[in-house]
Amino acid sequence: QINAATVTTSGTQTYNDPLTLLNNTTLTSNGAGALGNVSFNSTIGGAKTLTVNTAGTTLFNDNVNIAQLTTDAPGTVQINAATVATTGTQTYNDPMTLLANTVLSSTGVAAAGNISFNNTITGDKTLAVNTAGTTLFDKAVSIGQLTTDLAGFVQINAPTVITTGTQTYNDPMTLLANTVLSS
């Protein structure tokens, strides 16, 4: 359990046990490269927000069910979980690699449910994004398969969205850039 507003280390952070957030929490590692990795090797729960700041890799190795999730820009994020669920926004500012077929979902309404990918997404896995808010793809996507649900909106500001399988957009889509969709 974490009841602190901040946890800051000069090196790695590894959470091997199920983690419950009792407070809105920012985890920061000031380590360079792999010395800055923040790894969650079990579930994360709690009706609180989680922000992870690191120049290393943020690794989610199990399911997440929290209020809000944000990762910063200098590092990378890897998702090896079946689900990342929030009641609010999800904002990924790092390049993302999918290590498992993953469903990202938010039950937030309108802007409170936005799921934003502000950097690239790679990995030969399936990504499903379910939200009544806006799903934003701001950089290039190169994955196995992509599906968005019916409830929200999709905005694409990326030059390319490439999949080895299908792409299914069930939301209304707005193109913010000249974009090539390729499967």
Region roles according to the model:
Residues Q1-S183:
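Extracellular lectin-like interaction modules
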